[in-house]
């Protein structure tokens, strides 16, 4: 890559890192379709973007953990499932044709939008009722101060026996598509497990790094990673994610949810268009 292209990738990665950190999608979720639009094959885009996922997670997670928004206990439970799914998904990418991947993650993101509509309000999340036996045994709960809404928010995880296995599907999507898995993780945590929007976003960012690390090992061994491209994306998304982590605590939870849904709709349109284009080639 020449210097102009490297600089362009850095700028786009910086912007993607900010948005990815704010929404929990991960900077690579925004970066991958841009690389495809610039002419890079989908599988190479996914492989190199997976590397930057690790940087996005590391860059933003430190601040979120310090502010006590991220729920580490919930993250450790869900990572059991996402890491397994990430490895499986990476191998699927190497085996499946690109057109199948386009339509697969477009369908996947439509499911994300459906789950987003089922998310409860913050008041519902705060109530310690209708907790199943397994979730009571795990006892995953937390409290944090939201400077955007100017209130303390308490919550407890519900339906962990459903949310955990569904995270394996998110892991497969993260490993095979590298795009939209963050949105799916966030939707599962809010809509099924009952986490507040900001906790779901920050915990998703924390989980994304571990899932990406598992998938990256497969892509690196298969020769799909370009060191210069991956390094440029990693630097940009890492800086962007740090900036995003400074912005998130001061904006309202509703704003985070709306921004996440807008980006998800954009990704659906982009991938359906690419999939249809592949069919006509």
Identify the function of each model-found stretch.
Residues 18-28, 174-181:
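Short helix-coil transition sites and intra-membrane helix breaks within transmembrane domains
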Residues 20, 24, 59-60, 86, ...:
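Conserved kink/hinge residues within transmembrane alpha-helices of Major Facilitator Superfamily
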Residues 30-32, 58-69, 171-175, 185-190, ...:
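Generic transmembrane alpha-helix signature in multi-pass membrane proteins
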Residues 49-53, 204-208, 229-230, 234:
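Short hydrophobic/aromatic, small-residue-rich stretches within specific transmembrane helices
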